Design a protein with these regions (language model features):
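Glycine-centered flexibility motif
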Residues: 34, 45, 55, 76, ...
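Generic detection of long, well-ordered alpha-helical segments
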Residues: 2, 133, 137, 191-199
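Surface-exposed binding/hinge segments that line
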Residues: 1-111
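Basic, nucleic-acid-binding surfaces and adjacent catalytic neighborhoods in DNA/RNA-processing proteins
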Residues: 20-38, 52, 63, 80, ...
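Phosphate/anion-contacting hairpin/loop surfaces
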Residues: 68-166, 171-178
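Short, contiguous clusters of charged residues that form electrostatic/catalytic patches at enzyme active sites
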Residues: 3, 7-10, 141, 145, ...
Length: 268
């Protein structure tokens, strides 16, 4: 999810920014889709000029006008100076100061793409997605306009990357709880007051998760191996049957094939 990718980018920035890539070696031909055949050739010898994030994708820009775009999928993570290289380490990078980075992805649902930097904004996956939830672009007014007349559940629309970029299941559950919105409610029926609360809750939840290093569920760890600790402060996610704090009990339903955690007593 977005906080995990942001945490990853910040960790990589400390090691990669300004460094020359002495070698870049893909160790297989594909992940979720094919890895560009010329990726190693185009990146070897390049200097990293910046790192960033768009939605759930990480971006590594170079002085050759190329940008490496990575997606971690379900189980991907970058490792810095790994003690051993195994079968799940699918891309190796060695920098000019002797650091080694590996992209490790046991389930291979991630991806690696190499784009011309001046064409990144026009890449089809980026053209189709909505604004970033951090930075103030997503307001109650914005949500009201996007939700107008929609009968789909508000939770499902928040997961639609065309409306807001980068939101995933965990943080949508948490934001809806903070805004006291029932995830089953038709999006077009949510009041303007509650949409204002939701627009404030989304960045608050994400900022807190980034500050805590993300949520270490299953496979995620930052590049330096540190685990994220936001999961220890979840209000509802993964807490089915536990008390809410409002005298209610956290429940679980399935929406769109994913678990939704919420408190039926205080989320209306």
């Amino acid at each position: 999810e977005l906080p995990e990718v942001e945490t990853t980018v910040r960790g990589l920035r400390k090691v990669l920014e300004g460094r020359r890539l002495n070698s870049v070696t893909p160790r297989r031909a594909d992940l979720r889709r094919a890895i560009p055949e010329d990726l190693g050739q185009r990146l070897t010898g390049a200097r990293v000029t910046g790192l960033g994030r768009r939605a759930k994708y990480g971006l590594i820009e170079t002085d050759r006008g190329d940008t490496l775009v990575f997606h971690l999928g379900m189980s991907g993570r970058w490792r810095i100076d790994p003690q051993d290289i195994g079968k799940h380490d699918h891309l190796l990078i060695v920098t000019d100061d002797g650091r080694t980075l590996s992209l490790n992805d046991p389930r291979r649902f991630g991806s690696l793409d190499l784009l011309r930097t001046d064409a990144v904004a026009e890449w089809p996956p980026f053209k189709a997605i909505g604004p970033e939830p951090l930075g103030g672009a997503v307001t109650g007014k914005w949500l009201k306009e996007r939700f107008a007349g929609r009968t789909a559940a508000v939770k499902l629309l928040l997961l639609d990357q065309r409306i807001v970029a980068g939101l995933g299941n965990i943080y949508v559950c948490e934001a809806l709880f903070r805004a006291r919105i029932d995830p089953r409610k038709a999006a077009g029926k949510v009041s303007g007051r509650k949409l204002d609360a939701l627009a404030a809750a989304i960045p608050a939840v994400l900022d807190a998760a980034i500050a805590a290093g993300g949520s270490s569920l299953r496979d995620f760890a930052a590049p330096d191996g540190e685990l994220g600790y936001f999961s220890k402060t979840f209000d509802v996610y993964g807490r089915e049957g536990e008390p809410c704090g409002c005298d209610g009990t956290v429940g679980r339903i399935v929406q769109g094939g994913r678990s939704t955690f919420f408190c039926p007593a205080c989320q209306k």
